[in-house]
Amino acid sequence: MIGSSTPLNPVSRRIQELMRGHTDREEEAEIISLLGEADKTTLNESLNQLELGHLFNDVDDRLIGPDNKTRLLNLLSKDRLNDLEVPARAAIVDGLQRGPTTFSDEEHHFEGAPQPQAGGIEEQAITNVFLGTQATSLTGLKNAVNAGADEYDMHHLLTSDVDDNGLISQMFEHFQTEGSNRTGSVKPLSDIDDTFYSSLKDERFPGHTVYPGVLAFYDELDRGPAQQADPLGDLTFLTARPDEATGIVKERTHDTLRENGVKEASILLGSLTGLINHEAMARKKMENFEHYSRIYPEYDFTWVGDSGQGDALLGEMMLSKYPERVKGVFIHDVVNLSPEQRAEMRAKGVRVFDTYVGAAAEAHQLGLISDVGLARVGSAAQQGFDAIEWDSTEQREQAFALLQRDLERLPPT
């Protein structure tokens, strides 16, 4: 989406030339003119080719004028918004997220500028783009903003980048209006530690082993039982790992996920206070889930966690409060729950599993994945299992017994 590798069109090439070094007011005016006069195809292409974060930072409003940044943002977020396709709209939002978004309309590019305030022209432009996008295009825009596999996602946008409560309320109201008819699509939500890979309490696998079949399971939950044609990429991780101002935790978590096969996913982090106990962890994750579900009222959700850190409690809370939207809760057992405990949790709608083949069988039983999807998870789990470098023969045999037991639950192919 951002910084396309395709050859630059003449408009993009000229704008890049103008952006080299200091950009004066005449050069800024030429940039605005080039984008304003470009035909629809060229405009969309240019917005996907240019580094818009740099562009928005180069074009300024001045104390005595001209207000070129205001002109540029109004051009893109209002005057020509109807000409823009979803990728170009997402590129604008992304570019604005990567720069300052908390300044007043007095602007901020001259000595003696006012202190940052909420509701500046960048925040208003972001709001304009979302309010000017409807129906399935709005869903596509939100998903495109989420797709960067970095800290600049929808959650960050609405909790950190936009500070004006009035603008935030407008966007949430718009999301609710446009997403009032749920699509039937599911966004899979997952924990990371001892759910995606072994890291804290699970000694059945070597440390930091990605569980066999987990990636295939996420994909099948995303596809759904009808094998929907919409692109994959709805996966979101809800983790207790604490958030902090620098974004380092989120960046490192994204790096770890990419290294282990997750190409695109959003991450919703916890807090230091959320680490006090399992109940606090569950409450913080629930808070993040509720915020996220308001961004995506058109979607349903599934939750995949583990039995070690409050994820089962979170699943119960989700099912109790949002039974129509939470379609399945799957808990990976890493603490050897008793049969009685498993039965009690199942009675509350929480499905406990030992392998991702078992998780897929439970999801298939709930009508969340297809027959062919179930088979794909089984195949992926076997391949993943064979690739693990085990700590001991005993460790491998114990894990193999659980995998074989769950593979026997699958229908013959």
Regions found by a protein language model. Give the residues of each.
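Non-catalytic pre-domain segments flanking phosphatase-related domains
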Residues: 7-190, 394-395, 412
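Long, compositionally biased intrinsically disordered regions
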Residues: 24, 352-413
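Glycine- and small hydrophobic-enriched segments that form the cores of compact globular domains
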Residues: 154-266
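A short, conserved beta-to-alpha structural element at the edge of catalytic cores
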Residues: 216-228, 324-361
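Short, basic/hydrophobic alpha-helical segments
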Residues: 218-226, 285-299, 318
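A charged nuclease-like catalytic/ligand-binding cleft shared by nucleic-acid processing domains
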Residues: 248-296
